[in-house]
Design a protein with these regions (language model features):
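Phosphate-binding P-loop/Walker A region and its immediate neighborhood
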Residues: 109, 115, 201-294, 300, ...
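P-loop NTPase motor domains
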Residues: 51-65, 439-493, 575-762, 769, ...
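Glycine-rich phosphate-binding loop of nucleotide-binding enzymes
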Residues: 14-19, 47-62, 479-564
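Switch/coupling segment of Walker-type NTPase motor domains
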Residues: 50, 73-98, 522-617
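Conserved P-loop NTPase motor cores
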Residues: 492, 498-518, 522-528, 541-548, ...
Length: 913
């Protein structure tokens, strides 16, 4: 096969056919470490965002009026090793962060590699190639001679003629004009030479292990250089070392081994009827043989589009993602200006008039199709006349499927045809044109004349509705492996990285909403475990009677967890013993004024302040010492100060003798260690046994004072718990800390808990901290829930709560389709294998439907679930990624780019060792 590349200079491609193309990558994402990334779009978007995206695509199409660009939507293979490398980005090696021993994140990476091994994974990439025209370049006699020589050089075995500096400069200026026209539309960047070469390699290796796009994104190879005033490029002949055969023989279908043994396999080109194979009309695929093996691919041309389609169902290319196999598409565009298109419409109208006159002479009269055609032409003429910048899009669309065998390829082609047919699109797989349609998917090639019969005519806005220029993503570019994207038919990993959100000026706080048993606490535990395993710290306030978070911490973070049980009083949370200097005095005084219900500016408040200051100044400061100081003051003071000291000492004795306050006043207990950065990765504070006053009591002091002693002690102890969480979270901005608050309604029912949530949401980002909150209703997340950048919505059967959840995600709460999805489509009760489904929104405002996976790590699986009767001491078998996505049988291929994947795996382990 001959490659159409003559020279490559940056993103400019000189074709052997004499044309010059500028190749751009659309939606490129972050281009370098620390680079800014564009706002990406999820599968589920609000109507306003969809309209904005449609306007941008329409602008791009109209800005290229008069040109003939070509759009490539290519599915780049993803190797599990790539996911592993993304999981360790920003992770410090074990020797620096955890001392000697194995890094705790290694288990997670290995579990992810085991889960994804053998899965067919890909990511959608978009490329735009625009032919360039230059007055000084294309018309220069030496440029024309060089194009002609390129055709002869290949046959003579000689290198193509170099390109002069003048021509390179001229086409670069032409490319700048194209970029200026594209500005303001979609995000793009010039393609790299290695990426242009990858596009050809990808086309030739469909159905096989292909070179990874990740390597091409960072490669500096394949580009030409200007030397002595001319452009010299490396040889691209090796790219064409492949054999293309339409309807090639598949050993599995044609019993080629038996035919070879009988000597009946002839030389290539022997008549098909002399071989024991099917008719070529049934062998509508392209066999490509290269040095890596034999692959099969089928090219389908879009032959007919529906005359009218609703805006919600017009996203043809987005529907391709629903298939359980990847689909490439190539769209060759001819953009006709409005005036020229109107001339063509008038010509067609005149032809219709002539046909109508001819039919009038027949007894049957004029057929209804003529009336419909006249109506369509009239509507087209009116829309073209609406604005002078309108263009008519004449497109030839080629869809490509592939497989390791001809049978798999043929089955996928039939499935794609059926999907398009259900939407009133007709796709054909023409026999004899497979190679011609394949040629269209290569950069730098001319459009074969035989494919013009598949041209479709649309207005720019109508064509933009098909969604060819848009991609959908969910999650973050790197971080922890959370699960898979359920809006994609193939296995597409979803990753989130809450710890890196403050580094990109985003909030690291997350809110999770859903019914009981919908998976909120499992998702919280997975994220909290990933935070500490990646080098951060997690602080969890656990109110559950079974102390589920304490159980999880003891197994998941064994040896690195600290449990603070408020009811069992195993450690002390005495503020004077936990905090040094002014911080300890501040928290101690605030706790006592809250517990005793006294005014800070009263006589009792002044006496209490003096007692705290004196106790803190001693050699062994403690809350017990405050009681002793008050007793001493009551013995030596006189008057009102004596009475106040005696009264305060008596009240403190009442509180101190209660078991719930023992962890504050018992000097024999060891104090809590707040040096989390060096000794503890996970701190769990269990509040079982603590009671709080009802929320209505906080608005009426007289009602609050009448509450039981246990409720008043619980409120004051909660203040200290919040102080511990706040102090630890804001201690070291260099180390990310996440505060986990499950069932948030319990905490926000008090002023102290509400203040903690408020401070974490407003000040957490600048201190390298975030809030991870779970609730049954979005309203329970509080009035500041809009500051949460990460949002997840699980199954919510109540329609009113579901509406509030959708509004929390930024979606339309009145959308019936979304309401059905949330109320009955996410983790339906009783359906095995459907657990862990969420709608997830991340800081880039991309919302999608995901399935969360529990890694097959014993220390995690033994205690992460809370389903009664399902807690086991051995890890349950985890389904594969494809089985969890849906129960349909799915053909899989071997892991793509096996050698590259193995080297990536080795690099992961070496980095974390």
């Amino acid at each position: 096969m001959r490659v159409a590349i003559r020279h490559i200079a940056g993103h400019l491609l000189w074709s052997t056919h004499g044309s010059v193309w500028a190749v751009y990558r659309l939606h490129p994402g972050p281009d370098a470490p620390g680079g800014r990334e564009e706002m990406v779009q999820g599968t589920h978007v609000p109507g306003a965002v969809r309209e904005e995206q449609l306007a941008k695509v329409t602008h791009v199409v109209r800005s290229l009026s008069g040109a003939a660009p070509r759009l490539f939507g290519l599915c780049a293979q993803v190797d599990p090793g790539e996911i592993a490398l993304k999981m360790i980005e920003g992770i410090e090696p074990a020797g620096q962060a955890f001392g000697a021993g194995r890094h705790p994140w290694v288990e997670n990476v290995e579990a992810t590699l085991e889960l994804l091994d053998g899965q067919e994974m890909h990511r959608r990439t978009l490329w735009l190639a625009v032919p360039l025209h230059s007055e000084t370049g294309s018309r220069h006699p030496f440029a024309q001679l060089g194009s002609a020589w390129a055709e002869m050089a290949a046959m003579l075995g000689m290198r193509p003629a170099p390109v002069a500096r003048r021509e390179v400069t001229a086409y670069r200026e032409a490319a700048l004009r194209v970029e200026a026209a594209l500005a303001g539309g979609l995000a793009f960047r010039p393609a790299r030479p290695a990426e242009i070469v990858w596009m050809i390699q990808h086309a030739l290796h469909r159905g096989l292990a292909e070179p990874l796009l990740t390597e091409a994104e960072t490669s500096t190879l394949h580009g030409g250089r200007l030397l002595d005033g001319v452009l010299h490029s490396p040889s691209y002949a090796d790219l064409g070392q492949a054999r293309l055969q339409e309807g090639g023989i598949d050993p599995e279908l044609d019993d080629a081994d038996d035919l070879k043994m009988s000597g009946r396999i002839p030389r290539p080109g022997k008549a098909w009827w002399r071989v024991n194979t099917g008719s070529p009309l049934r062998r509508r695929w392209l066999q490509i043989e290269s040095d890596t093996g034999v692959g099969y691919q089928a090219q389908l041309a879009l032959a007919e589009c529906p005359p009218a389609v609703g805006q919600d169902s017009a996203d043809l290319f987005a529907q391709l993602e629903l298939l359980d196999f990847p689909v490439d598409y190539t769209v060759d565009l001819t953009l006709v200006p409005a005036e020229k298109a109107r001339e063509q419409v008038r010509r067609k109208k005149n032809e219709l008039i002539d046909q109508a006159d001819q039919y009038d002479a027949r007894p049957t009269g004029m057929p209804a199709s003529l009336t419909e055609a006249a109506h369509d032409l009239g509507e087209l003429d009116a829309r073209l006349s609406r604005t002078s910048v309108e263009v008519e899009v004449q497109s030839v669309t080629v869809l490509t499927v592939w497989g390791p065998t001809a049978a798999v390829c043929d089955a996928r082609a039939r499935a794609l045809t059926a999907l398009l047919g259900s939407a009133d699109y007709r796709a054909v797989r023409p026999a004899g044109l497979q190679e011609a349609l394949f040629t269209l998917s290569l950069p730098g090639t001319v459009r074969p004349g035989v494919v013009r019969e598949f041209t479709q005519h649309q207005i720019s806005e109508d064509w933009a509705l098909a969604g060819a220029f848009t991609t959908a993503q969910v999650g973050d570019p790197n971080g922890m492996f959370l699960g898979i994207d359920l809006d994609c038919g193939t296995t597409r990993p979803v990753m989130i990285n809450v710890a890196d959100a403050p580094k990109v000026d985003a909030s690291a706080s997350m809110g999770i909403v859903g019914d009981l048993g919908a998976g909120k606490s499992v998702l919280q535990k997975l994220i909290a475990e990933a935070v500490w395993a990646r080098g951060g710290c997690a602080i969890c306030i656990d109110r559950t009677p079974v102390r589920e978070w304490a159980t999880f911490a003891r197994t998941a973070a064994k040896g690195r967890a600290q449990i603070i049980d408020a009811a069992r009083a195993e450690v002390s949370i005495d503020p004077l013993r936990m905090f040094d200097g002014p911080e300890g005095r501040h928290y101690a005084l605030s706790y006592l004024t809250l517990q005793l219900g006294i005014a800070p500016m009263s006589t009792a408040g002044e006496v209490l302040h003096h007692a705290v200051e004196q106790a803190a100044a001693g050699p062994a400061p403690s809350m017990h010492r405050v009681l002793e100081v008050l007793q001493e003051m009551a013995a030596r003071e006189v008057g009102r100060r004596k009475d106040a000291a005696a009264s305060l000492a008596g009240l403190i004795r009442v509180v101190a003798t209660n078991p719930l306050a023992r962890m504050v006043f018992d000097p024999a207990l060891a104090p809590v260690r707040l040096d989390a950065s060096s000794a503890t990765d996970m701190i769990v504070i269990t509040t079982t046994g603590l009671k709080l006053p009802p929320k209505a009591a906080f608005d009426k002091p007289e009602v609050l004072n009448q509450q039981p002693l246990e409720a008043l002690i619980g409120r004051a102890v909660l203040y200290l718990i919040a102080a511990i969480a706040r102090q630890t979270a804001f201690e070291d901005p260099a180390r990310f800390t996440q505060v986990v608050l499950d069932e948030l309604y319990w905490l926000t029912s008090s002023a102290e808990g509400t203040a903690l949530v408020h401070e974490l949401l407003h000040d957490g980002r600048k201190h390298g901290a975030g809030l991870l909150a779970g609730s049954h209703d979005a309203a329970e997340l509080g009035p500041d829930r809009g500051l949460m950048a990460y949002r997840a919505l699980a199954r919510t059967t109540d329609r009113q709560r579901a509406r509030r959840g959708l509004e929390f995600l930024g979606l339309d709460p009145d959308d019936d389709t979304l309401l059905r999805l949330v109320t009955s489509g996410l983790s339906p009760v009783g359906q095995k294998g459907r657990q862990g489904e969420f709608l997830l929104t991340c800081p880039r405002q991309n919302t999608g439907r995901i399935k969360v996976f529990i890694p097959r790590i014993p220390r995690i699986t033994t205690s992460i679930t809370t389903t009664p009767g399902h807690r086991t001491s051995t890890p349950p078998p985890a389904p594969s990624a494809s089985e969890a996505a849906d129960a349909r049988p799915r053909p899989t291929t071997t892991s793509s780019a096996t050698n590259a994947g193995r080297s990536a795996d080795a690099g992961v382990k070496e980095h974390l060792r």
